């Protein structure tokens, strides 16, 4: 309880997907039964995979999750060591442009929000709430500038990250306007569903009440 959820961006459901190779025989979510599926353990893509399994009418035990970081997962995916891959941008965009995989489902298809959060230590939050407000205002301002000047934003991000400009352009296309604010009730409820699912899978040792670890700042004057 030393960490608090202090900020969140709007959902990005189009920025994550469950992929199979374009020549894969697997066509539906139900085809995942018994398959080896790469995913980063505990990530937003892990929850996407949980939702995919549920949508297919399967149990978690019906699949074989293979826990890999994105770079290792892509290598395994391309050499067919795994049958499918649950992943998010920009790795999703990079793979899409490089090898044209088939998308079995996106976060939008599966009602998986793919939220992004900002966390801070409770003592810092209590001592410096105004710093967080300034930070969120500046992040939101930067996002507005990126939305208004996409070509410039793409070049800056590509130069900084080393990603191909085409990859950056694709993932920015899928990224909605993303001002940062304190997590609201809908976002907290979304994250509670993730926490409950991860507890059920044994990824976290005990139940978590997300609302108890969300920053509740005083209203701005």
Which stretches of residues belong to each language-model region?
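Short, glycine-/small- and polar/acidic-enriched structural segments
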Residues: 1-59, 64-67, 83-89, 104, ...
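Short phosphate-engaging motifs
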Residues: 14, 25, 44-45, 73, ...
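Phosphate-coordinating loops and pocket residues in cytosolic domains that bind phosphorylated ligands
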Residues: 34, 97, 215
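Pocket-lining segment of extracytoplasmic ligand-binding domains
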Residues: 62, 66, 71-159
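Secondary-structure end/capping motifs
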Residues: 126-205
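Conserved C-terminal helix/tail region of periplasmic/extracytoplasmic solute-binding proteins
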Residues: 196-221
